[in-house]
Amino acid sequence: MNIFGVGLPEVTVILILALLIFGPKKLPELGKQLGKTLKSLKKASNEFQNEIDQVMNEEDESPKSIESNQTNEINQEKIDSENSKK
């Protein structure tokens, strides 16, 4: 078991110290608060990643739409040029 670079012996020592410092009555409350904090951090991280992905997708699509618009304009100019020759 290796969570955040902390192995099982280290986790055991941390839990024993927490038990000694906070006592058995406050540990469930602290665990609950820690869980809520980790959940909100994960949610914020996911939202941030989604925003980055959205911006990257917009940047990827922008050159395609510009190229498409330019191609359409060139084709329209060719058609107009051919029509004016007739």
Curated annotation (Swiss-Prot):
A GO cellular component annotated for this chain's UniProt record is: TAT protein transport complex
Q: Which residues cross the membrane?
A: 3-23
Gene Ontology BP annotations: protein transport by the Tat complex
Classify the protein's membrane topology as the record does: Single-pass membrane protein
Subcellular location(s): the record lists: Cell inner membrane
The region called Disordered is annotated at 56-86
GO function term, MF aspect, one: protein transmembrane transporter activity
Subunit structure, per the record? Forms a complex with TatC.
Matches recorded under NCBIfam families = PRK14857.1, PRK14861.1, tatAE
Name this protein carries in UniProt: Sec-independent protein translocase protein TatA
Q: Which organism is it from?
A: Prochlorococcus marinus (strain MIT 9215)
Organism ancestry: Bacteria, Bacillati, Cyanobacteriota, Cyanophyceae, Synechococcales
Protein's gene:
tatA
